[in-house]
Amino acid sequence: MARVFPQAAISSPYMSTERETFTVWMKSLVYQTNGLTVYNSNGEITYRVENYDKCSNEVHIMDLHGNILFTIRKKKLWLFGSWYVYRECGSFTSTEEVKPCARIKRSSIRDGDWEVRDETNEVFWILRFDPKFAFQIIDIHGNIIAQVKPKQSSNGITLGEDVLTLEVKPRVDHSLVVTLVTVYGLIKGIDGEVKQLRDFEEEEVAVGDEIAIEI
């Protein structure tokens, strides 16, 4: 059974024997649609997502020509849920028709981080950092598989929250890494909703206390 992140040299357009750097623009090329566009170091579009939305239960990762490489499906579990990743299964209507190649869920042992478990039961981690969209993907030994951080100009100026730099180590399937970046974007959307809910609850308590004092 294939690993999510194979380490052997493989002839694939989605892997390289060298470290690769991509620019991720958290926007769609299609007018007025949510999405994500990924450029390689030559400025060429390599991946795109046109139905990216924090409310989406299904998201497709495509190549430049619109061929579906991965499908992300969300399984709702209270506020957070978990995400299942399927290879080239955009035509499937039921998750029971094919097994996922990876599952992503909130870690039960690493607070604030997310667990990635592949079809061979190998575990990876998505480790978040202080900036809104900065994180690393590491293996069980702590080796960095890929990392994402805000993109900066040659003068060190951050280009914006929706423009990112993605670095992928050699012999890693960068199409799947882009898929995990997409999942993390969905996760950050959910986290934002949770924060808003907590802020609202705190405001409700504060208002209630104030009224009680006035009475």
UniProtKB/Swiss-Prot annotation:
Top-level lineage group: Eukaryota
Alphabetical list of InterPro entries matching this protein: LOR, LOR_sf, Tubby-like_C
Gene3D superfamilies according to UniProt: LURP1-related (2.40.160.200)
Family affiliation: Belongs to the LOR family.
PANTHER family in UniProt: PROTEIN LURP-ONE-RELATED 4 (PTHR31087:SF59), PTHR31087
Cited function: Might be related to the phospholipid scramblase and tubby-like superfamily of membrane tethered transcription factors.
Annotated protein name in UniProt: Protein LURP-one-related 4
Species, as recorded: Arabidopsis thaliana (Mouse-ear cress)
